[in-house]
Design a protein with these regions (language model features):
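Soluble catalytic domains of enzymes that build or remodel membrane lipids, polysaccharides, and related
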Residues: 230-508
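Membrane-embedded alpha-helical bundles of multi-pass enzymes
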Residues: 2-227, 436-437, 447-450, 463-464, ...
Length: 538
């Protein structure tokens, strides 16, 4: 209701405060909103200029402060388009422009809601300028909590936390996971915003004191994160793990048109590794990990495919975690699975993980009849992938693995469930053949956060790259190139302890989002009080 808006021209007179901040002129607010999105974009891989994330937060806050709600929505939407359209450009490489445009606009819609919320709380932060940073952090966490879950299970790509893979703030994931990192980034942005707003009380040199304190607080928050420990209690044991990146005949959606060639690539790369082991030039792995879609031929039903995988497992003398597409359980349905293949005995059906969060409109089509009215391309997804029901805890023998497949690494609960189930090592099986190197590096940034969050060594195995290993403090080693065949080995320590983030689970996010709701309610009370003051003065 526009009657409850914090009027931009009369509020200072009603409150009797000539120093109250006013909205930026629209000619400045619009470019500020666009620059906010671009600044945040540059914070993410492949650019990785992480300090720009809080700068983007500050610019968006400045653009929408004291705006009417519709203007806040529009400016937030501009920020969202500037951020998500280029970030998600890899979605149009092989599927056309429509999915990219629709997904980008949908994600931008959540920043439009954030713009509304930020404009709504303007009277609160005008009265309590020192609350501005905290309020900013709370609203960002609440926005991401909503975006991560809706619609159809949400799409967490582009969370502020995932821009901090090389930042000291990454260590905060050890305490409270991705939501706490997002809160810290947005809080830092709020500190910059409060420091940079143009009208502070005080006309002399003392007017710079609050500015200096806020900037110092932003720097202290970032630097202080280095004091947060990483890792978790270990078992004292290590395992040697080989990641096989077999590559594909060609990039794009039709990579699986040569399914046998993709399988052969991974078998042959493993046989080459086995030959190196026998020759004494390479260490023998305790475990081998193949990526998602390394066998798009169901090896449980196709004897030839099963024999080829067994050939590789027997040659290397170690279990292989195979990314496979399995037919069933019903006609027209399939499963995206990680299945353990043991030397000598073959498939271990007791150690099979089925992807719990298939990607909507890519691995299954919700509301297919309606979706077909928008685009006939939905029928490219001929078979719907069936979600699994159990966490990806795979007991390989040498180690207990926490397996997630592709985009699942972006979802807090799916990864945490594997650690709660006893995972000693995190594994991400992924197929980036339909995307590009930017998407792969964005995904690797998520793996780094998960490693710190749960105090576990982690690895990412991709069909085409980037594959690599991550230590519990977030450092990457053995990263492969893109669109190449590679086999990388590392000795990895096993951990069975639990970090504070693992223990508290979803509660920090719930608490921060709940406080955001309370802030919105409090701001509503101030708006009603303002309206009564205006009415009384007439």
């Amino acid at each position: 209701m526009t009657t409850l808006d914090w009027d931009e021209t009369r509020a200072a007179e009603v409150a009797g405060r000539v120093d109250a901040p006013r909205a930026l002129p629209l000619r400045l607010a619009v470019p500020a909103a666009v620059l906010a999105g671009l600044a945040m974009l540059l914070a993410f891989p492949p650019y990785g200029v992480w300090p720009l994330a809080p700068v983007g937060v500050a610019l968006l806050g400045a653009a929408v402060h004291r705006r009417r709600l519709r203007a806040g929505a529009g400016l937030g939407f501009l920020t969202g388009v500037a951020l998500f359209a280029p970030m998600l450009e890899w979605t149009n490489l092989h599927t056309g422009y429509l999915p990219w445009v629709l997904l980008s606009l949908l994600q931008a819609g959540y920043l439009a809601l954030l713009g509304v919320a930020t404009a709504w709380v303007s009277p609160l932060v005008d009265r309590r300028r020192w609350a501005w940073p905290v309020v900013t952090g709370l609203l960002w966490v609440a926005q991401e909590a909503l975006r991560d879950r809706t619609p159809f299970g949400g799409f967490p790509w582009g969370r502020l936390a995932f821009s901090q893979d090389t930042s000291p703030l990454l260590r905060l994931a050890w305490l409270g996971g991705a939501p706490l990192v997002t809160f810290a980034v947005a809080l830092t942005g709020g500190l910059l915003l409060a420091a940079g707003w143009r009208r502070w009380p005080g006309r002399d040199r003392r007017g710079w004191v609050p500015v200096a304190l806020l900037v110092a607080s932003a720097l202290a928050l970032t630097g202080g994160a280095l004091l947060v420990p990483t890792g978790a209690a270990g078992t004292g044991r290590t395992v040697t793990v080989a990641v096989v990146q077999g590559n594909v005949p060609r990039l794009g959606l039709d990579f699986n048109a040569q399914r046998q060639a993709v399988l052969n690539n991974h078998v042959d790369a493993t046989l080459e590794l086995a030959a190196g082991v026998d020759a004494g030039t390479r260490p023998r792995p305790d475990l081998v990990v193949w990526p998602e879609n390394s066998s798009d031929i169901d090896p449980l039903r196709n004897a030839s495919a099963g024999e080829r995988i067994s050939q590789a497992a027997d040659a290397i003398g170690a279990p292989i975690l195979v990314g496979a597409v399995l037919l069933g359980p019903d006609r027209g349905r399939v499963r995206n699975a990680g299945i353990l293949w043991r030397p000598g005995t073959g498939a271990d059906l007791s150690q099979l993980y089925t992807k719990r969060h298939p990607v909507p409109f890519a691995e299954y089509v919700p509301l297919r009849t309606i979706a077909r009215m928008v685009s006939k391309q939905v029928d490219l997804v001929r078979n719907d992938f069936v979600p699994g029901e159990r966490p990806g805890v795979v007991r390989s023998g040498p180690a207990v693995l926490g397996d997630v497949i592709c985009f699942e690494v972006a979802y807090d609960g799916l990864v945490r469930d594997t650690v709660d189930g006893g995972a000693q090592l995190l594994v991400v099986q992924t197929n980036n053949a339909t995307f590009d190197v930017a998407e792969a590096r964005q995904q690797l940034a998520m793996v780094r956060l998960r490693a710190v969050e749960h105090g576990r060594g982690a690895l990412m195995a991709s069909t085409v790259g980037v594959s690599g290993f991550v230590t519990p403090d977030g450092r990457v080693s053995g990263a492969t190139g893109f669109n190449t065949r590679a086999v990388v080995l590392r000795q990895m320590a096993l951990a069975d302890g639990r970090t504070p983030a693992t223990r508290v689970g979803v509660w920090p996010e719930l608490a921060l989002a709940g406080l955001a709701v309370a802030v919105l309610v409090a701001a509503g009370g101030l708006r009603r009080a303002h309206r009564r003051e205006v009415d009384a003065g007439r």
